[in-house]
From Swiss-Prot:
Protein name, as recorded: Protein YebF
Family label: Belongs to the YebF family.
One protein family per Pfam: YebF
YebF/Cmi domain segment(s): 30-117
Main location: secreted
Keyword tags: Disulfide bond, Secreted, Signal
Signal peptide: 1-23
InterPro entries the UniProt entry points to: Uncharacterised_YebF, YebF/Cmi_sf, YebF/ColM_immunity
Assigned GO CC terms: extracellular region
Organism from which the protein derives: Yersinia pestis
Entry-linked HAMAP family: YebF
Key word Kinase present: no
Length: 136
């Protein structure tokens, strides 16, 4: 009986540590025209837009990340673009976990499309600790 209970507790903890992977509905937003940007400028524009305009309005994402001021990074070498249409992978990290977005910046039409690809939550460090163990 103890082994079954322990196995269930461990399974629950392991499932909690694994992130859920799913794609969200794309969110399309209007942005100023941005024709002629290079990869570095695209990364700067997408990061600024996400931090200043999107995350303050996206309550579910703030809740999932655990903050309204996530750390955001974009690897410039991963940006793909042609004819002023750019695909930009963006990663946001918060207190509760990470979230990856695929962003398409269409400089000609002045739109940016955010698709949340996945989220990974970090386990609560207090879960699973032996409450009877104290300082020695």
């Amino acid at each position: 009986m103890k082994k079954t209970g322990l196995a269930l507790v461990l399974a629950t903890i392991l499932l909690g540590m694994m992130g859920s992977v799913h794609a969200q509905e794309p969110r399309v937003v209007k942005v100023p025209a941005c024709i002629g940007l290079n990869q570095s400028q695209v990364a700067t524009q997408v990061k600024r837009d996400f931090l200043q305009n999107r995350i303050p309005r996206w309550e579910a994402d703030k809740k999932q990340l655990g903050t309204d001021k996530p750390v955001v990074w974009i690897n410039v070498v991963d940006i793909i673009g042609k004819d002023d249409i750019w695909q930009v992978p963006l990663i946001a990290r918060g207190n509760k976990g990470d979230k990856t977005y695929q962003v398409v910046l269409d400089c000609k039409s002045g739109t940016m499309t955010y698709t949340g690809l996945n989220a990974q939550t970090r386990p609560d460090p207090q879960i699973g600790l032996n409450s009877q163990a104290g300082p020695k």
